[in-house]
């Protein structure tokens, strides 16, 4: 191929990608804005902190059925694990 053809193709691809004409991947971390990413981290860490503070409830029940175990249900609901 001629170098001019390659250059034109390269410029065309760059223009299309900058104007959002090319399809983007859905569900990619690249499409997530920074605020949503930080909210997800905050939610995960707050659930982990809550679980750590109620560790005795979680320790006494099986993790798989934590939302149906009466002993751990209050802790799980307060931590937002059984939404």
UniProtKB/Swiss-Prot annotation:
Keyword Cell wall biogenesis/degradation: no
Secretion signal, residue range per the UniProt entry: 1-21
Chain ranges of the ShKT domain: 50-83
Propeptide residue interval(s): 22-48
UniProt GO BP: neuropeptide signaling pathway
Alphabetically ordered keywords of this record: Cleavage on pair of basic residues, Disulfide bond, Neuropeptide, Signal
Cited function: Probable neuropeptide.
Listed name of the protein: Protein ShK-like4
Organism: Nematostella vectensis (Starlet sea anemone)
